[in-house]
């Protein structure tokens, strides 16, 4: 039952449902309609597999911006790799179908996504066009450390303007985003 999965990460078959509910669940099994972050954000803390899946999908979300705009990514098959996935996987990282949740629990979805993420990340870091789209942290201004929003362990992204910063700089400085500050100043 979706409610047990989303609230408790419980996939047991001990819950009985009516024939109507059974048919309905079968019909929606592959439909991506569950926003886990909106329904139960604490679920990511309950399941390491779901947490890892969310990290992979967030990484794909940021990688797609580079891959879909790079002509070299088309030539070396990276765009095709991305497009083998349903678009919601990389466009909406918190949206899941029941099938996705089951495959996450079984580790099957991770086996599909991880090689794709590795291939795309490798392309971005080696491609001159993609690498040129990297960020310099505006807080520390370290030009030798090019950062990318898909490096979730070391970067933070401003929710307002999507600028990218070292997480340590962003959190330690307790500053508002410099780009948002400039934009706000210009409007006055």
What is each of the regions a protein language model found here?
Residues 3-159, 168-174, 178-188:
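Cys/His-rich zinc-coordinating modules
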